[in-house]
Amino acid sequence: MARLIFLGPPGAGKGTQAVVVAEQLQLAHISTGELLRAAVTAQTPLGIEAKGYMDRGELVPDSLVLGLVRDRLQQPDTANGWILDGFPRNRSQAEALNLLLTEINQQVDRAVNLDVPDPVIIERMLARGRADDTESVIRRRLEVYREQTAPLIDFFRDRQQLLAIDGNSEVAAVTDRLVSALQVAA
């Protein structure tokens, strides 16, 4: 069993690795973005509330996201473990997640940080060809990451939960490196 959080800058390959590793290790892949979209589509009480924020272009409050995460972590398919992708994004979310996990008798086993140099990230994201992925937008997203999310590396390192992985390779090579490191760390 493994309960994992995937960290790293935008374009590092978190989502890609989360899907592949979850499949290989038979873990539930939990994407907060997908949780939000599914709750809105299903018109759950949390989804209806979240939709109001999303329609106004506002960030969905942490309390709503945590409610969705709490519900998802208690589903039967998470019994063998899970990978949380896209959450937490800052220290206060990480602290709230730790409290939530304590309440439901779970804990994070490892926070995996995919380390990729900025020039590689910029190249990867430009290659995706998305309209909103201009170099200036990508650089701004990296700044926001450094300000808000990068401090989580120290947060999880201080708790001896951090697993740093070189993400500057082809997808399969990073996956192999990651799965091997998780097996050693288990």
Swiss-Prot record:
Transmembrane segments: none
GO BP annotation list: AMP salvage
Gene Ontology terms: cellular component: cytoplasm
Protein keywords: ATP-binding, Cytoplasm, Kinase, Nucleotide biosynthesis, Nucleotide-binding, Transferase
Catalytic activity reported: AMP + ATP = 2 ADP
Record carries keyword Ion transport: no
Any one GO MF annotation of this record: adenylate kinase activity
Known partners and oligomeric status: Monomer.
UniProt-recorded name of the protein: Adenylate kinase
UniProt cross-references to HAMAP family, sorted A to Z: Adenylate_kinase_Adk
Keyword Kinase included in the entry's annotation: yes
Pathway where it operates: Purine metabolism; AMP biosynthesis via salvage pathway; AMP from ADP: step 1/1
EC number(s) given by UniProt: 2.7.4.3
The record's note on its domains: Consists of three domains, a large central CORE domain and two small peripheral domains, NMPbind and LID, which undergo movements during catalysis. The LID domain closes over the site of phosphoryl transfer upon ATP binding. Assembling and dissambling the active center during each catalytic cycle provides an effective means to prevent ATP hydrolysis.
Renumbered residue ranges of the record's region LID: 127-133
Superkingdom classification of source: Bacteria
Organism: Synechococcus elongatus (strain ATCC 33912 / PCC 7942 / FACHB-805)
Enzyme class (EC, first level): transferase
Gene, per the UniProt record: adk
Record's function text: Catalyzes the reversible transfer of the terminal phosphate group between ATP and AMP. Plays an important role in cellular energy homeostasis and in adenine nucleotide metabolism.
Major localisation: cytoplasm
Binding residues annotated for AMP, in chain numbering: T32, R37, E58, L59, V60, G86, F87, P88, R89, Q93, R130, R141
Residues annotated as binding ATP: G11, A12, G13, K14, G15, T16, R128, S169
Region (NMP): 31-60
CDD domains given in the database record: ADK
Subcellular location: Cytoplasm
Family under the similarity heading: Belongs to the adenylate kinase family.
